[in-house]
Amino acid sequence: MVAMAEAEAGVAVEVRGLPPAVPDELLTLYFENRRRSGGGPVLSWQRLGCGGVLTFREPADAERVLAQADHELHGAQLSLRPAPPRAPARLLLQGLPPGTTPQRLEQHVQALLRASGLPVQPCCALASPRPDRALVQLPKPLSEADVRVLEEQAQNLGLEGTLVSLARVPQARAVRVVGDGASVDLLLLELYLENERRSGGGPLEDLQRLPGPLGTVASFQQWQVAERVLQQEHRLQGSELSLVPHYDILEPEELAENTSGGDHPSTQGPRATKHALLRTGGLVTALQGAGTVTMGSGEEPGQSGASLRTGPMVQGRGIMTTGSGQEPGQSGTSLRTGPMGSLGQAEQVSSMPMGSLEHEGLVSLRPVGLQEQEGPMSLGPVGSAGPVETSKGLLGQEGLVEIAMDSPEQEGLVGPMEITMGSLEKAGPVSPGCVKLAGQEGLVEMVLLMEPGAMRFLQLYHEDLLAGLGDVALLPLEGPDMTGFRLCGAQASCQAAEEFLRSLLGSISCHVLCLEHPGSARFLLGPEGQHLLQGLEAQFQCVFGTERLATATLDTGLEEVDPTEALPVLPGNAHTLWTPDSTGGDQEDVSLEEVRELLATLEGLDLDGEDWLPRELEEEGPQEQPEEEVTPGHEEEEPVAPSTVAPRWLEEEAALQLALHRSLEPQGQVAEQEEAAALRQALTLSLLEQPPLEAEEPPDGGTDGKAQLVVHSAFEQDVEELDRALRAALEVHVQEETVGPWRRTLPAELRARLERCHGVSVALRGDCTILRGFGAHPARAARHLVALLAGPWDQSLAFPLAASGPTLAGQTLKGPWNNLERLAENTGEFQEVVRAFYDTLDAARSSIRVVRVERVSHPLLQQQYELYRERLLQRCERRPVEQVLYHGTTAPAVPDICAHGFNRSFCGRNATVYGKGVYFARRASLSVQDRYSPPNADGHKAVFVARVLTGDYGQGRRGLRAPPLRGPGHVLLRYDSAVDCICQPSIFVIFHDTQALPTHLITCEHVPRASPDDPSGLPGRSPDT
C-alpha cells in the first residue's frame, strides 16, 4: 500500500460532479488541454459513478489542474481534489448476474486468484445496495501487477455464464452503515462519527440516508479518517454498528441518475441543502446568468424546493426560478446571495409549478448581443423524464457554451449564449448526434487539420484573430493522431471561419533545417535545447517542431547511466594512450608500477608526488562531468606521465625484475591472464554493438544521418538568417575532447561506430583524435576510445570491427559464442533446477510439465556479469545483491537471449508498468502465464532461469529508462533496479544488459493435470524435442 501511495502521489486527481452524459473521451481531451484546464497528458481515467479518478503522467500537470479554481464541462461545475491512493486489498466487481449470493461471489474471486497463479486467500463480499455490483475485501494486499492479471483473467472466466468485470478502487472517503444500525437517529450518528475518541472519525462532509434498507452513507472530509473508521468496531446505544466502505458507483441506478442532476433526493440535514445549492449555483455561473433560468426539482411530496441566485448577471438582468413541481400543501424556499444593489433593483426569486413550462421550446441557442434579448432557460423535472443523454455528436453544442464561459484568457472567443430548454415530456428525448435548434438551424461541426507547428503558430501569433471569431466555437485538437481545430456553430459561420483560417495558414511557410552536429536531436529534446529553441522562437517570431527529432534519440538519455563508466581510465585530465608496443593490460601496468615503487623505495627516491595507479572512475553526479574531477590532494597540480619523471635506469631495472618474475609463473596462470585481457577487450568492443532495433534507423533521424528540425514562420521571415542563428547557438554548447597522441591511423570503421554509438563527430588532427558533441557524450566517447586503444593489439588483426560482434568475440575466446547443453534427467543439476521451478509455480504446479532443461553457457557475458557483481558487492547496502529469478519469453527470442543476454531491444516488450527495462519474476507462476511465455506451434513455452543483480532497488513506475533516483544527499545517484513493491517485491526490472546472466532454459508445456506419482513433475521421460 505504501508503494502504491508513493507511485500515485501528486498525479491522481479525484473528479466529482460529473454528469453521466459526458463521454470519457471528452473529459480526457478537456484535461489534456493545457489552455482550458491547465492539465497535460492523461495516463488513465477510471469512472466511478458521478466522478472518477484521473491520473496524469506528470505531477506538475495535476498541480496546475488542482490550482485552477473553476472547471466547467457539459454545463456542470466539476469539483477536483487530490485522489486517495488505491485500495490494494479491495476489488470492485461489475456485471453480476441476478441473484448472486455473497458466498458464490467469494468463490468466484478465489477461482480468479487460482487461475491467475496467485496465492488463494479467503475473501469477504461486502453488502451492496446495487445487486449487479459489489465490493470484495481481501485480507492481504495485491500488487499492481497482480490486479492487472486478475482483470485479464476475469475476461476469460465467467460467473454462471456471465462475464464479470473487475476493477480497482481508491481508498474510501465514505462509509455505509448497514443492518440494524442504519435506523439510528441521524443527529446521534453524526455526533458519534465526528467524535474521534469514540469512533476514530472526524469532520463529516455529508450524511444521507438511502431509501429502504440500503443503509446510511456518511462522507468524511478526509479519506484517512474513513479508512480509520473502517478498521474499528463500533457500538452505539447498546447495538453494534456494521460499517462497510461506500462508493457512488454502488448506488442504485435511479439514485445515480437523480444525483447526476444535482442534489441527492434522499439527502437529509442542512449540509445536503447547502451542497445542492452550491451545485445549482455552479450551473448559473457556467451560463454567466444570461437570461432567466428555471429548474424543476422533481421532488417527492413533503420535500421543499430551493432556488438560488448568485449575484449580478453579465448581460442585463437575470432571473433564476426553481419550480418544485409541488403538490398542494408543499412549501418552497428561496435563497439569495451576492450584492443586490449591483443591478439597480432587486430581482424576483420565486417558485412556480412545472405546468407553466410545458409550452416552451425544446432547445434554442442564440447569441445575446443586446440587453433586451432576454429569455428563460427551463429544465424539465429530472425525475419524470430522466437525464438528457448527450453523445459525441453534440460536442459542438458543448463548445458553444463552455468556451464562452471559460477562463478569463479565452473570454471573447464566443459571445454569451442563452439556452432555453422546455419540458422533456412535451418534446421527447434528445437523440444522439441530432439536435433541432429553434432560431438557428443547421448547427454543424467542422474539423480543420494542420501540422502541430502551424497550429502553435496560430495560437501564439494570431491569438487576437482567433478570439475575433465570436460566433463560432473553436476547440483545439491536440491528440497524437491529429492536430487542428474543431469548429462548432452555424453552418455559414463555420464555413466563413474555415476559409479565414485557411487564409491564415496560407501566410505561414514551413521549412526543414538540417542540423550538421551529431547528437543535435538528443540535445534539442533536452532541457537546455528546449530553452535555446524558445529563445529563438521569441527572437524570430517562429515555431520549431521537434516531431522529426523524436526518433533520433538513442535509448539512453543524458541523465541515465553511462555504459562506459566501468571502463578503466588513466590518471590525469588528458586522455593519454598506451603505445602500441606495450606488453600488458591493466594488470600488467599495475604490476610494473608496483615494482617501480618498490625499487624507488629501496633506492631512497622521492616519488610521492606522482600518481602511479590508474584512478577508478568515480560515481557520476547529475551533471555527469567526470572529466572535471581531480584526485583529492592534487587539485593544483598538472598530472605528469610516470615515464617522464622516473630515471631511465629505474624503468629498465623494473622491467627486468618484472620479466624475471613472470618467467617463474606457471603457464596456466599466464593463459588465464591473457584470456581475461581478451575478455576485457571484448567487453569494450561489445559497447559499440547496436541493438537490432536501433540499428534499423539512422541515429540522428532524417536523411544522410542529419537531424531535421521543422520550423513554421511568416513568409517574410528570412529563414537563412534563422538557420545561421541556430547553428551559432548550437556551436556554443558543443564540447570537445582530445585523445592522443596515437601513432597509428584510426580506422574509418572505428570512427563511424563511435559516432553512431555516442552521437559525436570524430576527426583526426595530426596524431590526435578530436571528439565533438553535446553534454557528457564527448567525454564518454573519449573514455571508450581510450579503452579501445589501450592494451596489446594483434598486429595482423588490426581493427576487425567490420565483422559482427559475435564472430569477433568468438575468435577472441577461441570457442563457441553460446552453447545450450541439455541436462540429463538423472543429474543433480537437473533435479535442483526443476525442484526450484515447481516450488514457485503455486497453483499452476499441477498444470505445467517440464519438457527439458538446458544449461546456457556464455563466457563473455559471464565475465561481464561477474565484474558487475563485484562492483555491487562493494557499494550496495542491501543483501543479497544477487537473486535467482525467472523470465518468460517467446520462442523467437530464445536464440537472441542465448547469444546476447537479456537485451532490452528484444526483451521487456510485454510490460512497461514499472519501467522500460527487462522484467524478472520471483516466482515462476508469473513467468509461465501465456502473456509472458506464449506457447509455440508445438505447445512449448520458454522460461529462463537467471542470476540477476538486483542490488539496491527502488519503486518502479511507468516511463523509467534507468533505475529510480535515490533520495537527496545519498552518495550514489540511482538505485540498481526497480521493483513493483518495496516491501514485498515480486517483479524486478533491470536496465543494464550485463546485470542478468541466463543459466538455464526450461522448456515446459501445459497439461490437464500432472501425475501425482512423479515428484519432479515429469510424467515419464521428456520427449526429444
Curated annotation (Swiss-Prot):
Listed PROSITE patterns: PARP_CATALYTIC
Biased composition (Polar residues): 321-336
Region (Disordered) location: 318-346, 569-589, 617-644, 1006-1025
Localization terms from the record: Nucleus, Nucleolus; Cytoplasm
Modification type Phosphoserine: residues: S378, S423, S431, S663, S1011
Intervals of motif PIP-box: 831-838
Signal peptide range: none
A GO BP annotation: protein poly-ADP-ribosylation
Protein name: Protein mono-ADP-ribosyltransferase PARP10
Organism field: Homo sapiens
Gene label: PARP10
